[in-house]
Design a protein with these regions (language model features):
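Catalytic phosphate/metal-binding cores of nucleic-acid and nucleotide-processing enzymes, i.e., regions
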Residues: 1-113
Length: 113
């Protein structure tokens, strides 16, 4: 079973190779959101500059859509803050995907993009 980090890594690599290279027109974006601090001091500093609990692991910008992706392993569940963030972005008309595998990510890209 892959870790959440390994699933995210596979998906980012796939996306960048398929949609994010210099020769791709349009060249799409997928980037991570570092939303964890190493300690309380760093966490407080990050909150002061905009850290938000529950934000998705990555964000995709297609030029038309903003898609928020949260990566979970087979047993992983969203925290209450993650669910709250999902509800917030969906209320703004944005897409939010919970991804558990590269295949699921590819399927979302095919059917929802």
């Amino acid at each position: 079973m892959l870790t959440e980090s390994a699933i995210q890594q596979e998906c980012v690599m796939y996306f960048r190779n398929k949609f994010g290279l210099k020769h791709h027109i349009p060249r799409l974006l997928m980037f991570s959101v570092p939303n964890e601090g190493k300690n309380m001091i760093e966490q407080s500093r990050k909150k002061a500059i905009g850290l938000m609990s529950g934000v998705s692991d990555t964000i995709i910008d297609t030029g038309k859509d903003i898609i928020y992706c949260e990566f979970k392993d087979a047993k992983g569940v969203q925290s209450p803050k993650q669910k709250e963030f999902q509800e917030h972005v969906e209320s703004l008309g944005r897409k939010y995907w919970v991804i558990r595998s590269l295949e699921e990510f590819k399927n979302h890209l095919t059917t929802n993009h």
